[in-house]
């Protein structure tokens, strides 16, 4: 009887071990499944250069992009249709857009594109929406000219960082990295190298930001 029990327990542990190994193997997707995937245009037609793109946490269908010639655009159907959500509030060149992870109704947009070329257009600071792009208000850094990236704290939508390239045609003291802790009402310059060195990107450590 003891022999049967031992064999039974041995079989149980072997089954558990094999099942666990199978589950671990299933967690790693086979790279070959992506071989057939092809890029496709999702619009909008003549939307201009897309200088900033972001998704919405918890939604696989909602996205925003910052157009260098047409403001901020939004889709809620994975790119089948797009709508300009900045018309009537601001327009022209936009270089950055970010959606809060903790409150997806909060969206920040930054003016001016970061792709330096002969015919770039500057922007007029940061804009903020509290209703997922339906309405917008100014949120500071009006003289920043070219905002390259916006990053929002993962748990506090009032804490936001801006990478500012500044005026690309001349030395400019409005360059570097800026931080706001009150939703864009006030900004503090937290990194400045020189008036000829701007910031073009930002990555946040969620535990130290």
Region spans (language model):
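N-terminal secretory signal peptides that target proteins for export/translocation
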Residues: 1-6
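Bacterial N-terminal signal peptides
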Residues: 8-20
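Sec/Tat signal peptide C-region and signal peptidase I cleavage site
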Residues: 21-25
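Beta-propeller blade termini and top-face loops
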Residues: 26-209
